């Protein structure tokens, strides 16, 4: 473990790792992880932590045996536990001479461009001061997070943060070694996949078949997070947080867990904001021909390739693109409103004028305003 290979790292610590499956925070485990992070900062690495555990801390504080299922009471536990969680981190980092800061985010905070940039500037300023920021979703107001909605888990939040600050590495620490060729609890001969260059449908099926729930997420959400982060030019590693000095080993370039290779194309700030998917107003479903033209040939989206639109959006809004099976392809700024897209979907370019009195050009979304995930 000589030096480190990364200047800026986001480390996601999940509930299963922090509690050891007991439902209570494992202070010894947390102390060891914080010690590794402190050692990393002394090597000049900037670190942000995305930490679960607020509800577990609140449950322990209130002496509850079981976690209630109703959302309002989970929010109460999150409110109680968040201060406890921050206090633990403060106690663990203080002996190393490090100050901690709390960063509570919601989807709405980052959904507009100014909020995205403000959050980015704050996190960068904290890193410049040498402060360890502990990020979590604001469970008290973000109902989607506790109900495990699509973008409401800390795997995806960690990818958002990595996207936001242009991290070099997103390290997702959990209680298994990484992604396997089969569920290792059912197939003893399952092999660890050490490197992933592309997240394919086959990999997604492997993740969906995993029996390990890993807190509120699971391997499916970890693949979603890896897709967003790697598309943003960030290296991603999923690894077992129980391995001795795992953070220091991975930061120095040692091989552990499953590594997801980043896209060769480094998106700019505007493209990264679009990639976050937080500002979308609707969805445009496109056919396989359009998917191929966009993904393989870097073409614009034309009306002929559109199958349907969902949601209400206007010209200039950001929309999600998905294929005929509902799989996300990317995001783009639309030249047409949802009403107009419904009118011209499937039409060839020379037919648009017969439907719309004044059209906005042949492209529904121009290639320059489109990012592929």
From Swiss-Prot:
Main localisation: cytoplasm
Protein name, per record: Glutamate 5-kinase
Record field: catalytic activity: L-glutamate + ATP = L-glutamyl 5-phosphate + ADP
A Pfam family: PUA
EC number, as in UniProt: 2.7.2.11
Positions annotated to bind ATP: 12, 216-222
InterPro entries assigned to the protein according to its UniProt record, in alphabetical order: AceGlu_kinase-like_sf (IPR036393), Asp/Glu/Uridylate_kinase (IPR001048), G5K_ProB (IPR041739), Glu/AcGlu_kinase (IPR001057), Glu_5kinase (IPR011529), Glu_5kinase/COase_Synthase (IPR005715), Glutamate_5-kinase_CS (IPR019797), PUA (IPR002478)
Pathway: Amino-acid biosynthesis; L-proline biosynthesis; L-glutamate 5-semialdehyde from L-glutamate: step 1/2
Compartments, as annotated in UniProt: Cytoplasm
Gene3D superfamilies reported for this sequence: Acetylglutamate kinase-like, PUA domain
Biological process according to GO: L-proline biosynthetic process
Residue stretches making up the PUA domain: 281-359
Function noted in UniProt: Catalyzes the transfer of a phosphate group to glutamate to form L-glutamate 5-phosphate.
Family to which the UniProt record says this protein belongs: Belongs to the glutamate 5-kinase family.
Keywords: Amino-acid biosynthesis, ATP-binding, Cytoplasm, Kinase, Nucleotide-binding, Proline biosynthesis, Transferase
Residues binding substrate, per UniProt: 52, 139, 154
GO MF annotation list: ATP binding; glutamate 5-kinase activity; RNA binding
Cellular component GO terms, alphabetical: cytosol
PROSITE patterns, per the entry: GLUTAMATE_5_KINASE, PUA
Designated gene of the protein: proB
């Amino acid at each position: 473990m000589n030096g480190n290979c990364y200047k800026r790292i986001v480390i996601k610590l999940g509930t299963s790792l922090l509690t050891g499956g007991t439902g209570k925070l494992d202070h010894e485990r947390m102390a060891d992880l914080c010690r590794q992070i402190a050692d990393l900062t002394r090597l000049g690495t900037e670190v942000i932590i995305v930490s679960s555990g607020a509800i577990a801390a609140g449950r322990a504080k209130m002496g509850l045996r079981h976690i209630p299922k109703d959302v309002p009471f989970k929010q109460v536990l999150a409110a109680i536990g968040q201060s406890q969680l921050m206090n633990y981190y403060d106690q663990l980092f203080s002996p190393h001479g490090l100050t901690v800061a709390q960063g509570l985010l919601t989807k709405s905070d980052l959904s507009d461009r100014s909020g995205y940039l403000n959050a980015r500037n704050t996190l960068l300023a904290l890193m410049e001061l040498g402060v360890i920021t502990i990020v979590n979703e604001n469970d008290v107001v973000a109902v989607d997070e506790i109900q495990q909605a699509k973008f409401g888990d800390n795997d995806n939040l960690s990818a958002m943060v990595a996207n936001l600050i242009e991290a070099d590495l997103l390290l997702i620490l959990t209680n298994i070694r990484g992604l396997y060729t089969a569920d290792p609890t059912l197939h003893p001969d399952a092999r660890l996949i050490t490197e992933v260059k592309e997240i394919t449908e086959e990999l997604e099926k492997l993740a969906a078949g995993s029996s390990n729930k890993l807190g509120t997420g699971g391997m499916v959400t970890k693949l979603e997070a890896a897709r967003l982060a790697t598309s943003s030019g960030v290296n991603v590693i999923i690894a077992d947080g129980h391995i001795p000095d795992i953070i220091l080993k991975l930061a120095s370039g040692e091989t552990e867990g499953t590594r997801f290779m980043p896209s060769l194309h480094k998106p700019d700030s505007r493209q990264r904001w679009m990639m976050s998917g937080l500002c979308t107003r609707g969805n445009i479903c496109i056919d396989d021909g359009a998917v191929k033209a966009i993904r393989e040939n870097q073409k614009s989206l034309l009306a002929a390739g559109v199958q349907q639109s969902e949601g209400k959006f206007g010209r200039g809004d950001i929309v999600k693109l998905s294929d005929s099976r509902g799989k996300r392809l990317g995001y783009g700024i639309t030249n047409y409103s949802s009403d107009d897209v419904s009118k011209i979907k499937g039409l060839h370019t020379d037919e648009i004028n017969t439907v719309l009195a004044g059209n906005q050009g042949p492209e529904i979304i121009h290639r320059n305003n489109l990012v592929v995930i």
